[in-house]
Amino acid sequence: MEKPSFSLAVVMQRRPSASRWQSEFWEPLSVLAGYQGAGEPRLLVEDAGMQQWLHPGFKLELHRDEAEGYYLNVSAPNPRVFVFWRLEEERQGGEADGKAGGRARGVPLQVTVSFNEAGRWLDGGHSVDGVAMPPEVFAWTGEYVEKNYRPEPRKRIKPRSFVHPKDRVG
């Protein structure tokens, strides 16, 4: 059975930094829902040291075991699409040895709408940022959650005063 999926493109932004230790700052800016294109990243905007790059070809897949993470996201005040990304050196044109040179570029690697999966990426020390969830993705994810998420029933914990003294721990 094929997993539900949604095509996306990620827009990464580079802007100058006022920091003495860092000359530029990269971050995911947005995702474009339903973007069907593929291929190499392309420059969309360049203005006063700021650049925006379109990275096409992402497929947002939903998995039943992540339904709780989707529920937590769509029920939050500001639902997000989480982008797992890293800095990679730009390759110099014509280098046969494949060595990197020049500046670093922010490159998105994966996307998710699960709070839990994004948290695991962060726990692993990766760069993960959330961007606003497009309405189409919100509706699609919400529908999936309604069909597939059932919260675990809560177990009542007896207050310690009602537990027999020989069964009390501590």
Where do the language-model regions lie?
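Amphipathic alpha-helical interface segments used for dimerization/assembly
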Residues: 137-149
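Terminal targeting/leader modules
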Residues: 1-135, 149-170
